[in-house]
Amino acid sequence: MFDMKRQLIPRYAYLPIVVCIVWNTLVYNMTRFFTNKMPHYDFSIKLDSYIPFVSSFVVIYILSYVLWIIGFLVFAKESRSLCNELFAAEFVCKTICLFCFVIIPTTMTRANVPSGGVLNWLTNAVYSLDQPNNLFPSIHCMESWICFRGALRCKKVHPMYSKVWFVLAILICMSTVFVKQHVFVDIIGGIVVAEIGLFLSKKFNLGRVYDVVRYKFIAITKPKKKTNKVVLKK
């Protein structure tokens, strides 16, 4: 028997997590093959010109990846139903992102980062690894908002957990514009898409799909018991 409290990842969360990773990779990277030669739009508004480049926020921007892993694992361990619901919401959000990335490909003008210093080096590293496209909606903001909304539903953690995640979500959203990886409209788009995904997942109980697939897989792979035939003598 497996002790659920000792498991880092509950068995029921395996499928949602794998689907999440695969779908995220496909949506974010494969869409670029279709939009590479398409015209890209800059959604910058006047407000963006007043937002300065602040290199220290690159630390929060990079740490967000670790924070998401923690956030998703926490609500995955909360319960099967919450795990299924929120991962289904995440799938819906990424699907919306796919259509946005292909239909309205976006770009922006990045900051001229001065050379020298660890923070500037980290920022340039982020710039070199991540092209200035697939910006609207902001996946950074979307994932962070899902983690915050998931934290509100978690009962097995400290009462301060959701408040901490709210602050983290705000800081991560701020980091996207202070590091000049996104514009303000991308933040709004990310939060709105997150709310749409959460609403649709709960409204239509989309998380049940994971249970259906899981049970069918178990039924197919489970070895059948041999039955001994009784031969009746005449």
List each model region and its residues:
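N-terminal transmembrane-helix/juxtamembrane module of multi-pass inner/ER membrane proteins
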Residues: 1-67, 114, 123, 226-234
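Membrane-embedded alpha-helical segments of multi-pass membrane proteins
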Residues: 22, 60-67, 139-143, 188-192
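Aromatic-anchored segments of alpha-helical transmembrane domains
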Residues: 25-26, 94-102, 167-178
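Alpha-helical transmembrane segments of multipass membrane proteins
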Residues: 30, 72, 98-99, 150, ...
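Membrane-interface loops
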Residues: 32-46, 76-160, 208-225, 232
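Membrane-interfacial alpha-helical segments at the cytosolic side of multi-pass membrane proteins
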Residues: 69-73, 141-161, 165, 191-201
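Interfacial helix-loop-helix junctions of multi-pass membrane proteins
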Residues: 111, 132-136, 171-199
